[in-house]
Every structure is written in structure tokens, then in C-alpha cells.
UniProtKB/Swiss-Prot annotation:
Protein's UniProt name: Flotillin-like protein FloA
Subunit structure: Homooligomerizes.
Functional summary from the UniProt entry: Found in functional membrane microdomains (FMM) that may be equivalent to eukaryotic membrane rafts. FMMs are highly dynamic and increase in number as cells age. Flotillins are thought to be important factors in membrane fluidity.
Family from the record: Belongs to the flotillin-like FloA family.
Membrane topology: Multi-pass membrane protein
Gene Ontology cellular-component annotations: membrane raft; plasma membrane
Organism listed in the record: Oceanobacillus iheyensis (strain DSM 14371 / CIP 107618 / JCM 11309 / KCTC 3954 / HTE831)
Membrane spanning stretches: 5-25, 28-48
HAMAP family the record matches: FloA
Locations listed in the record: Cell membrane; Membrane raft
InterPro entries per record: FloA
Alphabetical UniProt keywords: Cell membrane, Membrane, Transmembrane, Transmembrane helix
Pfam families: FloA
Length: 330
């Protein structure tokens, strides 16, 4: 009697445990939802996803969404994209948005864009609703030396075909900035830029700046133009200051050379005076030798003394005359 009661209990418990394991390992509720949505998928396919470490709802829910939107997307495509590390839900949303906007976007291209790190859904939205990129103030210098600052707004549309490998917004901003600087720099006068800012946008837009980028430039509008510094005057002032410093340095060099030359001449004068003193010291010795040898008589010596005395007297008279003349001038 007891065995007949225990056996059904064991069977019921085993069935409950088996059902719990089944519902835990096999997403039956998800399978039922897929069947209700008209998506034909085998329960063994869901079990295979579990074995391949794929979260079934990450694949089945986007598959249901794509089926309801009328897209022909296979389970294997979504699963392979999930295994590659892509965002399946975002790709499917992008495909639905592209389908509604009549944009040709195959699943392979959308998956490639997503795996390349681009937001494929945002790209599709930008293809429908163009985006406005605002640049910072771009400074350029006109030929008259006046700095002109321009603020540009760039209207771009995503180019689905060039999203993989195409340059981003930074390249667009850099190219537009280069074009604005070049256009301002080629203007003869800064007033030309102020009077006709459209010339900047027309010139820049005609250069095909969207080549090799993931965007198509629709328009470039100059939102604001300001006047900056007078760079030409600043450069001329700096150049004049530099020329003045160079001239002062050269003048100081010439003065130093003149002082050195003057000191050199003073040294040479002192050297000559020393030679004169040395020669004068030899005169008495020469006179004594001449008197001793008889080459010079006593009268000759007396005449020499008279001449020397006359010379000293003339020097004294000359000095007195010069001093009197200086006193009269004062």
C-alpha cells in the first residue's frame, strides 16, 4: 500500500524536475512567442543556440521584429552576427528604418557597418534627417593683415555606401576649416569677407570636401563673422622692434671696437714715449763719449746747450700764449 502511494509521488516529482530543467534550458516561452508571430523555428534550433552559448532572445526577438516588418532575414544571419560581437537588435532596427525610408540596405552591409564600430541606426536616421555640424570659430588673415573669424554650420547626410572605411565628422570639420582659412587668406581686404560671407561657403563647397568621408555635404553656411586682431600691424611692430635691437647691438659693437682701438693707441703712445725716454737717456752718454774722443769740442757743446735752452724757452712761451688765448675765449 505504501509502495503504491510513494511510486506516483516519485514519478510526479521526476516529471516536475524534468519540466523545470526543460523550461530552464529550453526557452519554450520564446518558442511559443515565435510561433505566435508566424516565425517558423524549431525547438532544437533554440537548444542548439544554448549549446553554442548564444542567448536565444537576443536573436529571436529581433527575428520576430524583422518578420513583422516584412524583412527577409534568416536566423543564421542574426546568430552569426551575434557571435561576431555585433548588436543584432540595432542592426535589425536600422534595416527596418531603411526599409520604411526606401533606402537600399542589405543585412550584410548593415552588419559590416555595425562591426566596423559605426552606429548603423544613427546612420540611417542621418540619411533621412540630415545632421548639422557646427564648427568652432575659424581664424584666417586677409591680405591687409586683419584677422577674420568665421563660424560655419555644415549640413551633412550619411552616405551608407561609404560608412565602412570613410572618415568621420572630425575630417569634415578640419577640411572645412582649411577651406575657410584659405578663402579668407586669398581676400585682398577683410571688408570683402564681411560684405559677402557667402563667397566663403560657395568657394569651400565647390572643393568637394566630402570625398573619402562617410558623409555627403549638402550645404555650408557661415553663421557668424567677427574681426580679430590686426596681425599685420603686430608683425610690423615686432619687426621694427627687432630691427631696433639689431641696430643697437651693432652700435654697441662699434663703440666697443672704438674703445678698444683707443686703448690700443694709448698703449702705443706710452710705448713710443718709453722709447723716447730710453733714447734721451743715451744722449748724455753719447755727448760724454764725443767730448772724450775729441769728436766734439767745448764750443760745440756750448752751442748745443744754447740751442737746448732756446728750445725750452720757446716751449714755455708757446704754452703761455695758449693759456692766455684759452682765458680770453672763456
Amino acid at each position: 500500500m505504501e509502495n503504491s502511494i510513494i511510486l506516483p509521488i516519485i514519478i510526479i516529482a521526476a516529471v516536475l524536475i524534468a519540466l523545470a530543467i526543460l523550461f530552464t534550458f529550453v526557452p519554450v516561452a520564446l518558442w511559443i512567442s515565435a510561433l505566435a508571430a508566424g516565425v517558423k523555428i524549431s525547438i532544437f534550433t533554440l537548444i542548439g543556440m544554448r549549446l553554442r552559448r548564444v542567448v536565444p532572445n537576443r536573436v529571436i526577438n529581433p527575428l520576430i521584429k524583422a518578420h513583422k516588418a516584412g524583412l527577409n532575414v534568416k536566423t543564421n544571419q542574426l546568430e552569426s552576427h551575434y557571435l561576431a560581437g555585433g548588436n543584432v537588435d540595432r542592426v535589425v532596427n536600422a534595416l527596418i528604418a531603411a526599409h520604411r525610408a526606401n533606402i537600399d540596405l542589405p543585412f550584410e552591409r548593415g552588419a559590416a557597418i555595425d562591426l566596423a564600430g559605426r552606429d548603423v541606426l544613427e546612420a540611417v536616421q542621418m540619411s533621412v534627417n540630415p545632421k548639422v555640424i557646427e564648427t568652432p570659430f575659424i581664424a584666417g588673415i586677409a591680405m591687409d593683415g586683419i584677422e577674420v573669424k568665421a563660424l560655419a554650420r555644415i549640413t551633412v547626410r550619411a552616405n551608407i555606401d561609404r560608412l565602412v572605411g570613410g572618415a568621420g565628422e572630425e575630417t569634415i570639420i578640419a577640411r572645412v576649416g582649411e577651406g575657410v582659412v584659405s578663402t579668407i587668406g586669398s581676400s585682398d581686404h577683410h571688408k570683402q569677407v564681411l560684405e559677402n560671407p557667402d563667397s566663403i561657403s560657395q568657394t569651400v563647397l565647390s572643393k568637394g570636401l566630402d570625398s573619402g568621408t562617410a558623409f555627403e555635404i549638402l550645404s555650408i553656411d557661415i553663421a557668424d563673422v567677427d574681426i580679430g586682431k590686426n596681425i599685420g600691424a603686430i608683425l610690423q611692430t615686432d619687426q621694427a622692434e627687432a630691427d631696433k635691437n639689431i641696430a643697437q647691438a651693432k652700435a654697441e659693437e662699434r663703440r666697443a671696437m672704438a674703445v678698444a682701438q683707443e686703448q690700443e693707441m694709448v698703449a702705443r703712445v706710452q710705448e713710443m714715449r718709453a722709447k723716447v725716454v730710453e733714447a734721451e737717456a743715451d744722449v748724455p752718454l753719447a755727448l760724454a763719449e764725443a767730448l772724450r774722443s775729441g769728436k766734439m769740442g767745448v764750443m760745440d757743446y756750448m752751442n748745443y746747450q744754447n740751442i737746448d735752452a732756446d728750445t725750452d724757452m720757446r716751449d714755455s712761451i708757446g704754452k703761455l700764449s695758449k693759456e692766455n688765448k684759452d682765458d680770453d675765449q672763456q
